[in-house]
């Protein structure tokens, strides 16, 4: 095992961003769509009982850090190791719960503060677009400057991220490089990461030497569970694909059979018409020859 552990794991991610307030503040300011006067200045972590419950099947694939700032804005930061079709809806549900939980009976609705859900996803889920950063919020369909400030959902597809030089988004690039480039195989850390005080501190936190044996067992178990969940999810997807393929093939076979039946029926009609015009056979004989009823033949 190398010098560093993967920062995306439950143990490491929470140790970095769940125990060091200034680092999660830096991450939020770098990744959230905040204006200059909206930057996060201080935060308090949510108490354990407030953190959303996870479905049993997803408990080992989701890492989260939850907090609120001095303006009472709520922040849910998640690292999603495997993608499921229900993930976006679950993110929306948990953000909505956090928003509703602010309201107390008799309170002024103006006191409600926005909720930001920042989600790092380790699998691509929008394969038809190149961008890695996806921001959803409540905006007027026609007048896009008209916004209802309440729920802000951000999804970052880590596999799509390519390190480039963005001077206006320097910290965003540095944090994403940290999350995508640092792992157990890292032998040499890029100078840009070491030169930044906050990222350099995060690097020290994920050094292998900083973890005891019990923590390493938990770390290894996390990745084992992720592998199992990925295997199960891939198997589920294959089953769905196989079922959809079988359904499509059955529908195609049915359509071909119906087409062949309609063609055969039309041929019988044409044969019956010709025989009727020739007047060489009785209606009963034509019916016997074509399989059509006498009533149908009479109507031709």
Predicted features, each with a name:
Residues 1-152, 162-164:
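Accessory alpha/beta interaction modules
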Residues 14, 29, 96, 177-180, ...:
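Generic alpha-helical structural context detector
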Residues 20, 24, 167, 235, ...:
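Hydrophobic (often cysteine-bearing) scaffold residues that line and stabilize catalytic clefts
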Residues 26-27, 90, 174-177, 201:
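Long, highly charged amphipathic alpha-helices
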Residues 75-80, 173, 180-300:
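Short, charged alpha-helical interaction segments and adjacent helix-coil junctions
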Residues 94, 132-138, 169-176, 222-223:
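Short intrinsically disordered coil segments
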Residues 150-173, 181:
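Extended serine/threonine-enriched, polar tracts that run as long, contiguous segments within proteins
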